[in-house]
Each structure stands twice: as C-alpha cells, then as structure tokens.
C-alpha cells in the first residue's frame, strides 16, 4: 500500500483538459527519449508514458531506484507493522486448509517491495509447522526491478542467492532464512504451474492505465504530447479520432464521463484466474481502489509528496486507483471473486484486535505506544482503514459446497463475509 502521506491528498474527479508542466529537475534523458518517440509516431497513450517512466530498462523509476521506506517515495503496510503480514500469513494457511491441504504449496508474490510481507508470512509458516506438516513449500517472487530483487534477497536469504542468465525461467534463486527454496522471475508466466497462493500487495496500482474522456463525438483517448510552445514540456491532449484502445476497452454500459482502464491488469487477472481454476489455490489482491465508481485517479509521488505526473518522468512514482469491478469482469466465470472489502473490515475479521491485545500485554510501554500507532495507521478510516481494499479470487470448488451442504459446515473465507461475495 502506498505511503500514508498520500491519503491526505486525494485528487479531484474532474474531466481532463489540455495541461502542461515543467521542472528544472526534469529527467532530461528519458524526456528526450519520450520526445523522440512522440516526434516519430505522434502523441503516446498514458499507458505507454507510464510504462516508459516506470519500467524503461535503463531509465525507468522502478529499475534504478530504491523507492521504498522513509528515504523513498512511499511506505507500505508491512513496513508499518508486522501484524499486517502475520494476518496475511494466517489467511494463506487458512485457504490452503480449506482447499484440501495440497501436498505442495507455492507462495507467489507479485511486486514484493522490500520483501517485508513475504518475510512476515514465512515467520508465520515457521510458527505453524505443526499445521503445515510435510507440505512442500516454495517461494516465488515476480519482480522487474533488479535493485529491489537485491533488497528482497538480503531480507529473505541474507543475500545468499545465485543469479542466472536469460536461458533460465528464473533470474535469481536461493534458500530463505527459514530453509525454503525461493526464486525470482520477470513475469508471472515463468512461475511453475501448481497449487499456489498469489499475493499482489500494491502491485496493480502501478500498472499502466489508459485514460478516456467522453466527448460530443464519443469516447476519445487522453494522450501525452510535446508542448509546441516549449519542447521541454509535456502536456495532455485529447485524441481527435477514436484509437484502438478507446474502441475496445470501454464497457458498453459505461456511464462515467472519464474512465481509466488498466488493460495489463485485466490480462494478469485472467492469467491468475486460469491458474487458480486449473491448478487450485487462491489470490489476494490488496490495493487502494474502487468498485467502478471513480474517474480521475492518476497521480504522481516524489519524496512522499504529491507530484505532477508529467514532471521529471523516471524520477517519480506514478499510480492510479485499482478498478476492482474491471478485475472482476476480467476474471470471468471460471473463478469466484470476493470483495472488495475495506482493509479495516478485513483485518478486524482476521482478528487484529485479539492479536493486538496479546502483543500489548507482553511488551514494555515504548513498544506498546509503537504498536498502538501502527494499529491506528492500518485501521483508522481516515488513514489506511477505508482507503485500501482487499479482493480475492478463488477456485469455484472452494465454495461449491454451499449448494449441497448447510452453510455452517462450509469453512468461511477468512477476512471476508458473505456480503462481499459477488
């Protein structure tokens, strides 16, 4: 989950108009690269702009920066409190048990950040060895940033890893501090098939989005262009004609006047749904987002401050709220989707209050104060509590028993209630 400081600066939902920006600190290298592309082919989509700014192999924000923590541009929930990761670890084991206790369990995290979440989950796995028994557990991390993969390796293995060339499906491997095999991949497609619990914690919000605006001539795409009055600036423009994206990505029943669509998120969710349907398992997606109600959420962050999205590309984090209604549509009928449910509700359903009482009773006053502060950050509706959402994708067999058995005999999905099932 992105930095708590973001929560105090919500962006207004307005229609896009032509706009420009400048900065003395603009990343001239990537700006020159973007300008060359625009001159050659015309204005580019917001999705292409985000892709270049964030994941360009040489100049991208995620490729060359350590953007996490107090010195970076955002802080995540696992870094705020270990309780968060512990409860997600309990959720993973609960779903593994409910699905029949497969003899092998792959824990797959998309965009693992510093590795804090996986680290907390592995601690829970170690504490509950008696429950997991002889289950063959392996850890699989999907990470595009070389810098972050090194940070994750240090956190999870003590940096005892080996790197590989492109002839391998994984580019790094090792053994965790708890003795489990761990692998790093560039793409989810490279992760081995098998029963898996997928975690995507603040992953989907950074994927490239297309932006669309309803006009008197129909839907048009918002594009990024060079400001003709100042070649050192970028600006937003609205396409005069339909684009392939505006012709294919807008839902027929769309009623909003401005829409953001993350086609890449749809593709990834379809892959997750296919794997879960065929191999078993579950996915838990955690992000700030909405259920098809918001319009303009595209924004940038740099040094824990709101930052113009067109200024200094490659030097700032770019993000947009996740549209969970779109993820649900892309998952299709082959799986069951639960949520979104607020972080506050999910963590309370998972027993965070009981866990807090145990920790508060066994620590000194200074640690208790820190625990209370962390709890407030995670649960308070004005902070992370209502802003962030939990969404799950499950194998249809997980809840199929409802048709043949009384509800009291069916193991509920931890963290979710019946009202959240769609």
UniProtKB/Swiss-Prot annotation:
Gene3D superfamilies: 3.40.50.12710. InterPro entries: NDUFAF7, NDUFAF7_sf, SAM-dependent_MTases_sf. Keywords: Methyltransferase, Mitochondrion, Transferase, Transit peptide. Its EC number is 2.1.1.320. It comes from the Eukaryota. It catalyses: L-arginyl-[protein] + 2 S-adenosyl-L-methionine = N(omega),N(omega)'-dimethyl-L-arginyl-[protein] + 2 S-adenosyl-L-homocysteine + 2 H(+). Residues 1-28 form a transit peptide. The keyword Transferase applies. Disruption phenotype: Impaired NADH:ubiquinone oxidoreductase complex (complex I) assembly. It is found in: Mitochondrion. The keyword rRNA processing does not apply. Its main location: mitochondrion. Arginine methyltransferase involved in the assembly or stability of mitochondrial NADH:ubiquinone oxidoreductase complex (complex I). Acts by mediating symmetric dimethylation of 'Arg-118' of ndufs2 after it assembles into the complex I, stabilizing the early intermediate complex. Belongs to the NDUFAF7 family. This is Protein arginine methyltransferase NDUFAF7, mitochondrial. The lineage of its organism: Eukaryota, Metazoa, Chordata, Craniata, Vertebrata.
